[in-house]
């Protein structure tokens, strides 16, 4: 029950999302990649972390005073007074930077060339809403709904999901809330899904592929999302789309859900629906896909992974994983220029990590 630094062989996203931020000051893992979902969650939760470290770690450090310097990739065990003083100074400087950023709240986000952009937050559950409001985000650009599944040992019911989505929408008070449908697979695993082991899960049955092959799970989530959309500005986003045929199948299932809700006399909204652009296939098909949806969301982490043919979970490849690689930037440029087919007043493109 005391504040601590967790040292582990590895932490899965499902374990990371359940960490108590009031007690876990930091964590260090021997395995893992700085580009993994565990690393992304650490940043989202504002928990300093060292992931995939080559620093020797033994049971001998258990119970000792430690300092984790996530910025420089260092861990200090039983630090001397001089090191303590330096680290406290760095922590103070970091706090001052955060306070300076708070002074920017309420101002418009304008680029150097005068373009106004919207800055939205990414969240994994309703617990993240306090930080969203505190930092004056213009909305929620990505609600990773899969963490509602990862935090538990059984499937969340329609009612449980509905209440969470509704709470988020009402808390945001009319600001956009973009909820991504279930994106399980790769490094995000749930035992109760009973998924077969795969040699290359990043290329396997994940995200929309699971939803389309197990429509009963998908329909439960869609019912909750459409019901919640009656209480706020919710949009629905589908991950790992690679073809128009997938979108057509989604639309068929959505039509079934809306028909069922109508027949049952259950109120629901008409949320905008978009897709994730995460693969070269989606980039090359974007002109056709744009005719089917209201918006695109470019997921740069997976787009980088699939464009560069680099496993983002492999720490040995971290040096080669470059989201600023010219090929990745050209992929993004292809999607945001007018000829992509989505540039209009009604439709939009967003980018997230």
What do the predicted segments below correspond to?
Residues 2-3, 8-135:
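Acidic, glycine-rich flexible loop/linker segments
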Residues 99-353:
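Conserved alpha/beta-domain cores
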């Amino acid at each position: 029950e005391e504040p601590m630094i967790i040292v582990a062989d590895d932490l899965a996203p499902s374990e990371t999302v359940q960490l108590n931020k009031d007690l876990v000051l930091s964590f260090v893992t021997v395995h893992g990649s700085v580009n993994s979902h565990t690393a992304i969650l650490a940043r989202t939760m504002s928990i300093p972390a060292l992931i995939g470290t080559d620093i020797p770690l033994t049971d001998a450090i258990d119970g000792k005073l430690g300092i984790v310097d996530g910025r420089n990739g260092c861990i200090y065990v039983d630090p001397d007074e001089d090191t303590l003083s330096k680290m406290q100074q760095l922590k103070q400087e970091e706090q001052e930077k955060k306070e300076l950023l708070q002074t920017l709240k309420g101002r418009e986000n304008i680029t150097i060339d005068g373009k106004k952009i919207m800055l939205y937050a990414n969240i994994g559950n309703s617990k993240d809403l306090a930080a969203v409001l505190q930092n004056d985000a213009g909305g929620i650009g990505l609600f990773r709904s899969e963490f509602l599944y990862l935090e538990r040992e059984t499937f969340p019911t329609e009612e449980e999901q509905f209440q969470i989505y509704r709470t988020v929408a009402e808390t945001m008070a009319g600001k956009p809330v973009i909820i991504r449908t279930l994106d399980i697979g790769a490094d995000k695993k749930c035992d109760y899904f009973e998924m077969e082991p795969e040699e290359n899960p990043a290329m396997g049955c994940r995200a929309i592929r699971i939803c389309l092959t197990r429509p009963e799970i998908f329909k439960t989530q869609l019912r909750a999302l459409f019901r919640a959309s009656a209480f706020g500005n919710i949009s629905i986003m589908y991950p790992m789309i690679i073809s128009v045929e997938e979108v057509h199948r989604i639309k068929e299932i959505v039509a079934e859900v809306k028909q069922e809700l109508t027949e049952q006399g259950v109120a629901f909204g008409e949320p905008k629906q978009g897709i994730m652009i995460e693969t070269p296939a989606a980039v090359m098909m974007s002109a056709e896909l744009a005719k089917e949806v209201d918006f695109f969301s470019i997921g740069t982490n997976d787009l980088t992974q699939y464009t560069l043919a680099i496993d983002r979970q492999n720490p040995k490849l971290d040096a080669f994983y470059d989201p600023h690689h010219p090929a990745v930037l050209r992929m993004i440029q292809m999607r945001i220029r007018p000829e992509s087919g989505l540039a209009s007043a009604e439709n939009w493109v967003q980018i997230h990590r």
